Amino acid sequence: MKLTDFYYDLPKELIAQHPAEPRDHARLMLYDRQTGAVEHKYFYDLVDELHEGDVLVFNDSHPTGGKVEVLLLTPVGDDRWEVLVKPGKKALPGTVIEFPEGLTGTVEDRTDFGGRIIKFAYEGDFDAIIDKIGEMPLPPYIHEKMEDPDEYQTVYANERGSAAAPTAGLHFTEELLQKIRDKGAEEVFVTLHVGLGTFRPVEEENIEDHQMHSEFYSITPEAAATINKAKAEGRRVIAVGTTSIRTLESAGTTGTLQAGSGWTNIFIYPGFTFHIVDALVTNFHLPESTLLMLISALSTREKILKAYEIAVQEKYRFFSFGDAMFIH
């Protein structure tokens, strides 16, 4: 398939610069993945679309907020992180970067995608230092500075290590999550640390030639057992966000979800066979992006682009701080 097959025209004024307030008052497009039929709701109506026994799978990764000299992407162990450094030409292996609050970082190696591996040295709590000296990394289409960094955190974020928030989860409030529990749906948490690939555009004309950047994921035995039980009983597994769907399909290629951790560069596009996920909660994605290709795989490219055309006509808000779709 060609990259241009996934192009659509989006007026810039529809790119959301701030999240809805309250979070669950964003709009929600209900999308039937078989027929392409759409309905227009609000996100707080999602609970009405859920069934008792549904399992919602959330990504609990937590953006690091570390953009001063470097952009923290993914922790790789022993106080080492994969990072992007600007300007990169000054970050040769062996370079020591000094930060405020007594934090230093030594560049140890280059990565395949233009990043670096840095080992940090510090006294005290690393997370607290980063929170104090860093700023939240935002997508390049967000031009306004956040007043409150919590705007770019899910209410359930727990595992620090992402370069960006799993943004479909931004719409959930504690109150909505409680209503979902009261409905009889279950919630399960997995972890995928969103990395460099989130910001990397597709450059190959044939999308099959695109190579995804690897990202770290983790699935607990308890999470895998809950999801496998639901699959065996014919209950729906609903991924909240494309990061959750990539985690589940990476570890579920046999139809049974495997607990554990590892790295995935899974690239989901039309023709992909889903083994775990039945439905998806997601935002509206960039033209010609891997995420638009992913949701097209859940339905068809033509039907998804038609839904996006309707979203533009109805003035839905797009991208990370924008409105949502429930693809079911």
Walk through the language-model features, giving the residues of each:
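Surface-exposed, charge/polar-rich loops and edge strands
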Residues: 1-328
